Amino acid sequence: MAAHILSGRPVVESLHARIQQVLARRAPHQGPPTLTVLLPNDPSAQAYARAIRKQFTTLSLNYRTEEIDDTLDESRFAILLKRLAEDESVTGILALQPLPKGVSRRSLARLMPPTKDVDGVSFEQQGRLAIGSPWIAPSTPLGGLILLQHYGIEVAGRHAVVIGRSPVVGRPLALLLLARDATVTICHRRTPDLAKLTRQADLLFVAAGQPHLVKPDMVAPGAVVIDFGVSVRDGRLIGDVDPAVAEVASALTPVPGGTGPVTTAVLALNLLRLAGLLEENDLFPGAP
């Protein structure tokens, strides 16, 4: 039996409705929150920025860009972030990848002002997530779990296998899963016999950045598979999971149209948190 396809569209519609309810309750003197995107000269980043702009326009949220070039060094990057941190009209800041060559991810984590960190990259936000008290969680992994919640797929008590350990998806995803009472295994490029572990998963999350890495024989019958991968092959978007996995899994996110749109909607939710319009414990809207 073919897997149930976990489309991101109804999840986005539900999140948009939640966001519009929150915005409708804000005080009369409060304007809409404003996101500033640090935009490199990179086609993938620019495509993502357009997707953000499209959703934010639909939601009547303010959106700005600051173009950054590859020659920007750490000192000038620090000046830019300091200026945005002091700008009262800026609610949140998002630094799109790739970063300038002179700016490391560690530098970004150190320099990003935590109170305007819309994607949970700062040391403070990462630390809060690590101790199980997140305020702003990275939008991609959080979006994946909100998607599961939307479709009524339980996380607690299940074995979740995560392929990928990046600081923006795999690692924070593992911490979020632990906070939701899953039993978590993390796999990466040095993991021996990857398929042996993936076949043990009730929930398989794939964020490896390798097109069609996961084949049907790597998935347990009835498993739920969440694909965070996005690559371009022959002019079309493909994920880290071979579409043939749909013949084995019970549920599977598509690429495109799965986790990607949900990620963007979660950025909007995070912006509302930074604006003080959502409670700290409202990490999973609608969750018990």
UniProtKB/Swiss-Prot annotation:
It comes from the Bacteria. One of its GO terms (molecular function) is methylenetetrahydrofolate dehydrogenase (NADP+) activity. NADP(+) binds at G164, R165, S166, V230. It holds the Pfam family THF_DHG_CYH_C. The keyword Oxidoreductase applies. Pathway: One-carbon metabolism; tetrahydrofolate interconversion. InterPro entries: Aminoacid_DH-like_N_sf (IPR046346), NAD(P)-bd_dom_sf (IPR036291), THF_DH/CycHdrlase (IPR000672), THF_DH/CycHdrlase_cat_dom (IPR020630), THF_DH/CycHdrlase_NAD-bd_dom (IPR020631). Keywords: Amino-acid biosynthesis, Histidine biosynthesis, Hydrolase, Methionine biosynthesis, Multifunctional enzyme, NADP, One-carbon metabolism, Oxidoreductase, Purine biosynthesis. GO terms for biological process: L-histidine biosynthetic process; methionine biosynthetic process; purine nucleotide biosynthetic process; tetrahydrofolate interconversion. Its EC number is 1.5.1.5, 3.5.4.9. GO terms for cellular component: cytosol. It catalyses: (6R)-5,10-methylene-5,6,7,8-tetrahydrofolate + NADP(+) = (6R)-5,10-methenyltetrahydrofolate + NADPH; (6R)-5,10-methenyltetrahydrofolate + H2O = (6R)-10-formyltetrahydrofolate + H(+). Belongs to the tetrahydrofolate dehydrogenase/cyclohydrolase family. Homodimer. HAMAP family: THF_DHG_CYH (MF_01576). Catalyzes the oxidation of 5,10-methylenetetrahydrofolate to 5,10-methenyltetrahydrofolate and then the hydrolysis of 5,10-methenyltetrahydrofolate to 10-formyltetrahydrofolate. This is Bifunctional protein FolD. It comes from Thermomicrobium roseum (strain ATCC 27502 / DSM 5159 / P-2). The gene is folD.
